[in-house]
Swiss-Prot record:
One of its GO terms (biological process) is tRNA pseudouridine synthesis. It catalyses: uridine(38/39/40) in tRNA = pseudouridine(38/39/40) in tRNA. It comes from Halalkalibacterium halodurans (strain ATCC BAA-125 / DSM 18197 / FERM 7344 / JCM 9153 / C-125) (Bacillus halodurans). SUPFAM superfamilies: Pseudouridine synthase. Formation of pseudouridine at positions 38, 39 and 40 in the anticodon stem and loop of transfer RNAs. Keywords: Isomerase, tRNA processing. Residues 232-263 are annotated as: Disordered. Residues 241-263 have a biased composition (Polar residues). Belongs to the tRNA pseudouridine synthase TruA family. This is tRNA pseudouridine synthase A. Its EC number is 5.4.99.12. The active site is at residue 53. GO terms for molecular function: RNA binding; tRNA pseudouridine(38-40) synthase activity. Substrate binds at residue 111.
Length: 263
């Protein structure tokens, strides 16, 4: 057996999240279905660096699986993409060490969130941006965002139903900037709690709207209560980005991006 690592992109619009769920279309379900076909009916388990929610997209989700097949690693994207639906694409594949783990080998993870700030809605971006019609004080949001840097207990920024006990995480970088009529949020850290990024964005948007002050962030963190933070921003504006792996790096396979014609 050998372990294969993949970098996967997907449009989360028509998925009930990444993780397999009964009677639901999921990214993991599609990947495992195709791998089962390739392995002549043998079930293959796929493990991901993160489990995205309904409607959330990914540009570089890292996954791994074990296989007894011996064909060249650069054939995996071709084999998988030939059977995957158009809203999933394997960008890269690599042979990785046996101790490589898509989740636990991730040193840092990065997410981006897109907010459309124009007065007019855009039907072509409705699945990829959260439309906010009211004015936003970006400087106030930036002052608030820097208070999230460092290691904190992020209980206030975690969904109440989350079962994880240790809610201490480290945020290495948080930034927001304008690109045309969009406001882009970028957050990088060593790991994220359930709905953490979306709650952070929702809270910053309330600060930008003047419903909260930038100085409230410290109090929200100290409260360690979900009720202290703002609303959870919708999933469709969120994109799971790159993961920095500690052992086993996915490199380009010197092949043409197999997904260029699919989007």
């Amino acid at each position: 057996m050998k372990r294969i690592g993949l970098k996967v992109a997907y449009d989360g619009t028509d998925f009930a999240g990444y993780q397999i769920q009964p009677n639901e279309r999921t990214v993991q379900g599609e990947l495992e279905s195709v791998l089962k076909n390739i392995h002549k009916g043998m079930s293959i388990r796929v493990t991901a660096s993160g489990r995205t929610d309904t409607g959330v997209h990914a540009r570089g989700q890292i996954v791994h699986f074990d296989t007894s097949l011996s064909f060249p690693v650069d054939r995996w994207p071709i084999a998988l993409n030939s059977q995957l639906p158009a809203d999933i694409c394997v960008l890269e594949a690599a042979d990785v060490p046996a101790d490589f783990h898509a989740r636990y080998s991730a040193k840092t993870k990065e997410y981006r969130y897109r907010v459309l700030t124009s007065a007019q809605a855009d039907v072509f971006r409705r699945n990829y941006t959260y439309h906010v019609r009211y004015p936003l004080d970006v400087e106030a949001m930036q002052r608030a965002a820097v208070q999230l840097l460092g290691t904190h207990d992020f209980s206030s920024f975690c969904a109440a139903k989350a079962e994880v006990e240790d809610k201490v995480r480290t945020i290495e970088d948080v930034a927001l900037w304008r690109e045309g009529d969009e406001l882009i949020f970028s957050i990088r850290g060593n790991g994220f709690l359930y709905n953490m990024v979306r709650i952070i964005v929702g809270t910053l948007l309330e600060i930008g709207a003047g419903k909260r002050s930038a100085e409230e962030v410290a109090k929200i963190l100290a409260a360690r209560s979900r009720e202290a933070a703002g609303k959870t921003a919708p999933g469709h504006g969120l994109i799971s980005g790159r993961s920095n792996m500690t052992n086993g790096k996915l490199e380009n396979n010197k092949t043409t991006n197999p997904c260029v014609t699919k989007y």
